[in-house]
């Protein structure tokens, strides 16, 4: 009897969902995608990586990434440093790890006095920097494997939600002694959908 009641209840729920499936799916999609900005990295070879960004965890890093991406700063740049089992790094306008946007932003991690709860797990995106804590600019890296030893030292600010196979493919390419791919891994574009939310510009140092 209880089993039949459960089945009947399920059918009623399914019927209700079916009547409003279009509206419900749209609502779920809007809820799922509007909570965080969504970044789309499109590679020259057609590969696509999608990431959600976390402005509550690292607001300056997220503002900076959105500003650079949507101003087409990253278009045509490469992943210049690739270490399989560790990370892939891009965002340098010089293509060799020495370039940036002409300014720096605050390093949002605990060693620099900023609470950041996002651990450097596989798929997490974080800001690359030089030795100085507040030296991040445009360069970023995506963890190819769990790298929690970076926690507290680098500003993690988002995570891959689609396209880890593309990250894996980039991480698997042959590199030279400086970890630069022998064949350029070109970023065609990076764009961030903020779903109408204005995040503003980062504080530039």
Question: Residue ranges of each PLM-predicted region?
Answer:
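Cyclophilin-like peptidyl-prolyl cis-trans isomerases
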Residues: 8-9, 13, 18-205
